[in-house]
């Protein structure tokens, strides 16, 4: 031991090496075991305070218990026809998927009302109503996510939308599957009882398909591993949800949520699934189609093949049998044709054309789309093969110069979008105010 060792002391409390049990050395600093223990206590207190702020508090003064959620009256439950009618006002086509969703939501309400009825025993006759989770399959831009978002607006139960692409198996970089429940909890204002009667829509579920049909010796942490992690949640379990999101750790208090009564709706494009069905059914495309009809003929054939979808096709695609078994209801959405894109532009309550008319009305300008221009926009969107999502991009390109110029022009009261403008051959036609027109010269 050197002559300097006896003078070593803790850089925080100042105690010498002889006064403490252990002195830990760092680059030019020292900390004793007592200070380390004190730091741990401070961190634990801070974690508890943060958890209390997120609704986990144990102090009745700071966090009074929330009132139980209002019971669902069976007579007030929206009927399937009413739910579908509301969806029809906002989403074009996809009648079969709308019926599936309407019935599923209605039955979900009925299960909740039966369990919340104090005078009724849900299993008095030995019959217990189980939930039926749903899988929506359809190409990109056909309305899967929009259907879910529209449903959320009319429901009296919490509705959350989650993305499966960010999920990974526990212990790896990414989000735990419990973060899906955290989104529902946040929508329910951190009311656990309210969240436990909610609905969750998991988008891009096809992205967690395992990379190979055969089991691999390497871990598939964002595919099969996520499916395995979701199994109990879909079926019904008591999950531990970290109130601040992220990964769970031993020093963090978790909120327990029972998922037995949470309805799960999953959606995905499942690109290439038609090829899997085709190999099983044995249907091959034969014959000829007229020039220009190749795309529509292929989409029609894909839609027909999806009508023959069976669970074994999804297993071949990469979904594990246990996962498919927990989603008994499967609905296919059709690709959007040109006619449907025209209707999407004009008919829904929140149609794109109506949105831009409202925008220009705020500048005291009346916006008009010629019918042939709307048809040209739909044709261009159909060529881009991204469904209804392409419509906003096309209209935004068309309106950029108009929306840039009009706020500075007080002499314009009408703007007309023509098919030539859609085809990039001309600019929008602007109609001037009568007071702004040049006066005719006197003879």
Swiss-Prot record:
InterPro entries: AAA+_ATPase, ATP-dep_Clp_protease_ClpX, ATPase_AAA_core, Clp_ATPase_C, Clp_protease_ATP-bd_su_ClpX, ClpX_bact, P-loop_NTPase, Znf_CppX_C4. Residues 1-51 form the ClpX-type ZB domain. ATP binds at residues 139-146. One of its GO terms (molecular function) is ATP-dependent protein folding chaperone. GO terms for cellular component: HslUV protease complex. The keyword ATP-binding applies. GO terms for biological process: cell division; proteolysis involved in protein catabolic process. PROSITE patterns: CLPX_ZB. SUPFAM superfamilies: Glucocorticoid receptor-like (DNA-binding domain), P-loop containing nucleoside triphosphate hydrolases. Keywords: ATP-binding, Chaperone, Metal-binding, Nucleotide-binding, Zinc. Zn(2+) binds at residues 10, 13, 32, 35. Belongs to the ClpX chaperone family. ATP-dependent specificity component of the Clp protease. It directs the protease to specific substrates. Can perform chaperone functions in the absence of ClpP. NCBIfam families: clpX (TIGR00382), PRK05342.1 (NF003745). Component of the ClpX-ClpP complex. Forms a hexameric ring that, in the presence of ATP, binds to fourteen ClpP subunits assembled into a disk-like structure with a central cavity, resembling the structure of eukaryotic proteasomes. This is ATP-dependent Clp protease ATP-binding subunit ClpX.
């Amino acid at each position: 031991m050197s002559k300097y060792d006896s003078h070593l002391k803790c850089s925080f409390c100042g105690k010498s090496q002889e006064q403490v049990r252990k002195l830990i050395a760092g680059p030019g600093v020292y900390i004793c075991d007592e200070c380390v223990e004190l730091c741990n206590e401070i961190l634990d207190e801070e974690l508890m305070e943060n958890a209390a702020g997120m609704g986990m508090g144990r102090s009745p003064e700071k966090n009074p218990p929330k009132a139980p959620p209002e019971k669902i009256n069976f007579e007030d439950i929206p009927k399937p026809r009413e739910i579908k009618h509301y969806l029809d006002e906002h989403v074009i086509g996809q009648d079969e998927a709308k019926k599936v969703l309407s019935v599923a939501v209605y039955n979900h309400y009925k299960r909740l009302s039966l369990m919340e009825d104090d005078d009724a025993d849900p299993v008095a006759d030995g019959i217990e109503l189980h939930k039926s989770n749903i899988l929506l399959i359809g190409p990109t831009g056909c309305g899967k996510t929009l259907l879910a978002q529209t449903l959320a607006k009319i429901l009296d139960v919490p509705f959350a939308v989650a993305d499966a692409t960010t999920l990974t198996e526990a212990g790896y970089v990414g989000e735990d599957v419990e973060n899906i429940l955290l989104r529902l909890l946040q929508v329910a204002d951190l009311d656990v009882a309210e969240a436990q009667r909610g609905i969750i829509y998991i988008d891009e579920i096809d992205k967690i398909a395992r990379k190979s049909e055969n089991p691999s010796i390497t871990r598939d942490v964002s595919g099969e591993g996520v499916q395995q992690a979701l199994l109990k949640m879909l079926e019904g379990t008591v999950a531990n949800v970290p109130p601040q999101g992220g990964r769970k750790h031993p020093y963090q208090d978790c909120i327990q949520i029972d998922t037995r009564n949470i309805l799960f709706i999953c959606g995905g494009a499942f690109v290439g699934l038609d090829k899997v069905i085709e190999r099983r059914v044995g249907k091959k495309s034969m014959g000829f189609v007229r020039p220009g009809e190749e795309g529509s003929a292929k989409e029609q054939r894909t839609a027909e093949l999806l009508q023959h979808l069976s669970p074994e096709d999804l297993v071949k695609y990469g979904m594990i049998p246990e996962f498919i078994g927990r989603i008994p209801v499967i609905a296919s959405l059709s690709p959007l044709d040109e006619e449907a894109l025209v209707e999407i532009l004009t008919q829904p309550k929140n149609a794109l054309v109506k949105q831009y008319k409202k925008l220009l009305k705020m500048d005291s300008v009346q916006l008009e789309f010629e019918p042939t221009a709307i048809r040209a926009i739909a044709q261009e969107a159909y060529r881009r093969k991204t469904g209804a999502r392409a419509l906003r991009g096309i209209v935004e390109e068309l309106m950029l110069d108009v929306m840039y110029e009009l706020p500075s022009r007080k002499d314009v009261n009408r703007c007309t979008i023509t098919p030539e403008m859609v085809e990039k051959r001309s600019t929008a036609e602007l109609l001037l105010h009568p007071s702004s027109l040049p006066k005719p010269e006197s003879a």
